[in-house]
Amino acid sequence: MKKTKRIFTALSHLFSPKWWKKNWQRVVFCFFFAVFALLLIFRFVPIPFSAYMVQQKIANLLQGDFRYQIQYNWVSLENISPNIQLAVISSEDQRFLEHLGFDFEAIQRAIRYNEKSNKGIRGASTISQQTAKNLMLWHGQNWLRKGLEVPATMLLELTWSKKRILEVYLNIAEFGNGIFGVEAASRYYFKKSAKNLSQNEAALLAAVLPNPIIYKVNKPSLLVRKKQTWILRQMGNLGTEYLSHL
């Protein structure tokens, strides 16, 4: 009984505003040191799971969906078709090789668009930002998550090459409910390995990013088909030689 009381007392001190006010700098330092150490490790080894996978699993369990399963198969970039590599860059981040994690030109364009348009919010997240968010953070539109995304992206760019960032992005991006990574997506939708994806298949997968819950690969809307066609044009403009600079 005394042991239980001591545990609750320790927890009450840990979560008290006074404790956090006194120790927040130490907590932040330890958090980013741990993130930095993990990024150094994951620079060389396959990623076993991402924070977003864990978030989705827990969310479904809390909703009573015990049948929810994560489909995830890690593959190296050499075993991923250049078509899908080029497709996601064409769709999500055409200045991927030029920026250091943040595309300020895209941010300015998004701000101007959002000020003038009533059609919804346009984002400007780079592949690096999306990778940092999916790997280390949670999804949601709040300032805390957005604030943490900035240093997380900077650490990612500091410790990983562009090639590694793209490799991890392609392996942990969600392409459907519980379907993570291009290998799992390729096998689920097209019954083939990611190594053998055609240009049309790659563009269709990229067209549902970054919101594959609303936009479906297996039931593509007119909007998805239009985006697929646009991605194919952009792939032609970039050219496969773009990937040689990774």
From Swiss-Prot:
<dbReference type="Pfam" id="PF00912">
    <property type="entry name" value="Transgly"/>
</dbReference>
<dbReference type="GO" id="GO:0009274">
    <property type="term" value="C:peptidoglycan-based cell wall"/>
</dbReference>
<keyword id="KW-0997">Cell inner membrane</keyword>
<keyword id="KW-0573">Peptidoglycan synthesis</keyword>
<keyword id="KW-0472">Membrane</keyword>
<dbReference type="GO" id="GO:0016763">
    <property type="term" value="F:pentosyltransferase activity"/>
</dbReference>
<comment type="pathway">
    <text>Cell wall biogenesis; peptidoglycan biosynthesis.</text>
</comment>
<feature type="transmembrane region" description="Helical">
    <location>
        <begin position="27"/>
        <end position="47"/>
    </location>
</feature>
<keyword id="KW-0808">Transferase</keyword>
<dbReference type="InterPro" id="IPR036950">
    <property type="entry name" value="PBP_transglycosylase"/>
</dbReference>
<protein>
    <recommendedName>
        <fullName>Biosynthetic peptidoglycan transglycosylase</fullName>
        <ecNumber>2.4.99.28</ecNumber>
    </recommendedName>
</protein>
<keyword id="KW-0812">Transmembrane</keyword>
<dbReference type="InterPro" id="IPR001264">
    <property type="entry name" value="Glyco_trans_51"/>
</dbReference>
<keyword id="KW-1003">Cell membrane</keyword>
<keyword id="KW-1133">Transmembrane helix</keyword>
<comment type="function">
    <text>Peptidoglycan polymerase that catalyzes glycan chain elongation from lipid-linked precursors.</text>
</comment>
<keyword id="KW-0133">Cell shape</keyword>
<dbReference type="InterPro" id="IPR023346">
    <property type="entry name" value="Lysozyme-like_dom_sf"/>
</dbReference>
<keyword id="KW-0961">Cell wall biogenesis/degradation</keyword>
<dbReference type="GO" id="GO:0009252">
    <property type="term" value="P:peptidoglycan biosynthetic process"/>
</dbReference>
<dbReference type="InterPro" id="IPR011812">
    <property type="entry name" value="Pep_trsgly"/>
</dbReference>
<comment type="similarity">
    <text>Belongs to the glycosyltransferase 51 family.</text>
</comment>
<dbReference type="GO" id="GO:0005886">
    <property type="term" value="C:plasma membrane"/>
</dbReference>
<dbReference type="GO" id="GO:0008955">
    <property type="term" value="F:peptidoglycan glycosyltransferase activity"/>
</dbReference>
<dbReference type="GO" id="GO:0071555">
    <property type="term" value="P:cell wall organization"/>
</dbReference>
<keyword id="KW-0328">Glycosyltransferase</keyword>
<dbReference type="GO" id="GO:0008360">
    <property type="term" value="P:regulation of cell shape"/>
</dbReference>
